[in-house]
Amino acid sequence: MTRYKAIISYDGYGFAGFQRQPHARSVQEEIEKTLTRINKGRPVVIHGAGRTDSGVHALGQVLHFDLPEDRDEEKLRFALDTQTPEDIDFISVEQVSDDFHSRYNKHSKTYEFLVDIGRPKNPMMRHYATHYPYPLELGLIEEAIAQLEGTHDFTGFTASGTSVEDKVRTITEAKVRFDAERNFLVFTFSGNGFLYKQIRNMVGTLLKIGNKRMPIEQIQRILAEKDRHLAGPTAGPNGLYLKEIRYEE
């Protein structure tokens, strides 16, 4: 068997998430159907580096799969790109060693979150950015977001019901910038892993701080007390993008 690593992007609007699930359309299922056709009807299972939720997009999701023979990498990429649905794009395909695992090999992830702060909002971006129609002070958000960098227990920013016991994660980059051309706020978070709905909960909290309905010091309180009720609301999935995954050599 030959193992392949692929980098893909997808429009999350039409999917119930990346992971295969009954009675709902998923990115995994669509790709596996295409690979099974290419593999002459023999089932192929893919393994993704991350499991994005319903409505969440990806610019650089990584996955791997095995096929019984060597194939030309570009021809395989082209076949997958043209035979999968139009809301999935295969950016690259390459052969990798048999011990490569997209999820378990040590890596870091970068996410972006887009917030449309225009009044009126841009209706063409309603599935691709979360609209926030209330006044915001960027300086307050910048001061608050810097406190998220470093190694912390992010229990207070995690959705209830998660089965993950160790909630300590390291965020190496947390920043926000204003995109004047689109009238968007662009949040960027990089780290060694993120908990269920962690980024959406952090963004919801930061927007509340920017709107002066929560003090900047609330970030430290949430981290210290590990209480989800102290954080802001969960931002919508439509603004979230898995931007890049980087593997250690």
Curated annotation (Swiss-Prot):
It is an enzyme of class 5 (isomerase). InterPro entries: PsdUridine_synth_cat_dom_sf (IPR020103), PsdUridine_synth_TruA (IPR001406), PsdUridine_synth_TruA_a/b_dom (IPR020097), PsdUridine_synth_TruA_C (IPR020095), TruA/RsuA/RluB/E/F_N (IPR020094). Gene3D superfamilies: Pseudouridine synthase I, catalytic domain, C-terminal subdomain (3.30.70.660), Pseudouridine synthase I, catalytic domain, N-terminal subdomain (3.30.70.580). Signal peptide: none annotated. Belongs to the tRNA pseudouridine synthase TruA family. Homodimer. This is tRNA pseudouridine synthase A. It comes from Streptococcus sanguinis (strain SK36).
